[in-house]
């Protein structure tokens, strides 16, 4: 079974002039990067702006990408830089409530006939809101590491590159984040 071209192959094809390759890359990563911005505290409109700035940087720098690291590591490094550039000097943080109330962005999805029951849907929405609030309550460094792993699918090593933190530091941040999230969600088990 052929899984198709890798992200790195698609970026190389785009750099060589294949616009369809960029379209496929964008399609693969647009939603996870958008959710990363939302979960980091950006309102939907700001997340969209940051997403576009991130992809513009990918377009401008596609020819310079050297596949020593995975494309996703590079992409989330660019995304993180765009977010930091935006928030630098700002005191106003935005709530993640927009993401919690948007059914397309809910972190949990219930599928099946039981999901059609209003009481089950209400519990599912409440549980999703509780989870988003628990993620939002994490210290920034722990939240970022968790989101890069959960939303971006990055490995410990890749998160260390993106956040410019040591491997053991990233491991600790993820461990503390998971402990806090498990504790916050105990009532939902």
Q: Which residue ranges define each predicted feature?
A:
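Short, charged helix-capping/linker segments at alpha-helix termini
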Residues: 15-24, 34-53, 167, 188-189
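Helix-turn-helix DNA-binding module
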Residues: 5, 132-169
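Conserved RNAP core-binding helix
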Residues: 10, 26-30, 34, 44-61, ...
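Structural recognition of an alpha-helix C-terminal capping motif at a helix-to-coil junction
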Residues: 49-56, 69-81
């Amino acid at each position: 079974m052929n899984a198709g071209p890798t992200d790195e192959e698609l970026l190389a094809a785009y750099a060589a002039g294949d616009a369809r390759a960029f379209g496929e890359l964008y399609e693969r990563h647009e939603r996870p990067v958008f959710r990363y911005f939302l979960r980091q505290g950006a309102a939907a409109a700001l997340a969209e702006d940051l997403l576009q700035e991130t992809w513009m940087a990918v377009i401008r720098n596609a020819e310079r990408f050297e596949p020593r690291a995975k494309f996703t590591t590079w992409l989330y490094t660019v995304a993180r830089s765009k977010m930091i550039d935006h928030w630098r000097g700002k005191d106003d943080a935005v709530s993640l409530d927009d993401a919690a109330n948007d059914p397309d962005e809910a972190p949990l999805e219930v599928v099946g006939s039981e999901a059609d029951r209003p009481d089950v849907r209400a519990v599912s929405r409440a549980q999703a809101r509780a989870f988003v609030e628990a993620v939002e309550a994490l210290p920034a460094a722990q939240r970022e590491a968790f989101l890069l792993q959960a939303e971006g699918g990055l490995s410990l090593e890749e998160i260390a590159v993106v956040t410019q933190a040591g491997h053991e530091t990233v491991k600790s941040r993820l461990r503390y984040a998971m402990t806090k999230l498990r504790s916050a969600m105990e009532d939902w088990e």
